[in-house]
Amino acid sequence: MNGYRPSSSQHACQQNPSPDAGTASARLSRRSFLIAGAGALVGAAGRVRADAPIILGQVSLSFYAVAGAVVHEILERMGHTVELRQGPHDEIFPMLGDSAIDLMAACWLPEGHAAYWAKYGGNAMEVARLYDGARFFWAVPDYVPASEVASIADLAKPAVAQRMTKVIQGIGTAAVITTVSQKAVGEYGLDSLGYSLRPGKPAEWTGAYDAAVAEGRWIVFPTWAPQYLNRGGKLRPLQDPRGILGGVNHASLVAPRGRFQALPATTRAVLARIDLGLDGVTEMDWLVNVGKKTPREAARLWMQANDGRVSGWFR
């Protein structure tokens, strides 16, 4: 090997072996056997890990579900079995921290999920940047004049406060948009004017918006991008001069470092290339909430329409 040739003295030892040489040879054979056996065990362990189900965690909101569905589809195309874990933020992030899942879709950084990441992301890593431009904001329906309501601060104007629905419907208490919206109510002095934030289920949140629009009623709507209601241009974002709701984020597919490194190299490489874009997630979210597709169906439709982009992930 590597151009090595035994010397004549070595040949002589091989032709006339001494008892010591025989003992050494036996030791060498035993050592080779052990090394080969260990290699076989490592190979078997690698095959077992490659064949084991991949556990995908995601927050149970539709825009996370469609991003997760694309990851799910990609993994199945590569021959993996996928087990899905869904729940609110305060259930899924601890699973990431405990290495109880292989992947999680998705984490907003650097600000959106900063507190969760600081608490549960110490042994985790960003796998792929799924989309940029993610942000939280408050909005009003487009029929509310911008000349009267352009920023969150304008909600305190007497004429605006008189017309605006005072109950601001939010989503679950563990969601970051709920936390920052509650802070905004206080920071902008809206609580003293009768405004209040009411956490609820996603259906209650969208239901409050739909009911207000149907009645032409003024309403403030805490929301985010990507989200399907942004697709029609019927929501107008409000400025946040105090910066309470935070800045722009990117959303990443994340994973416990050890569990991700245990995945096959090809799988890791393909996952790292996934790029959905803000518009892609918005479109899939619209297919779920308006088109009444399942997240998996929405993911397949979007992937078919963007076949060239998806094929590039497998290059």
Regions found by a protein language model. Name each.
Residues 68, 87-123, 208, 227-234:
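Pocket-flanking alpha-helical
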Residues 1-28, 35-43:
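N-terminal secretory signal peptides
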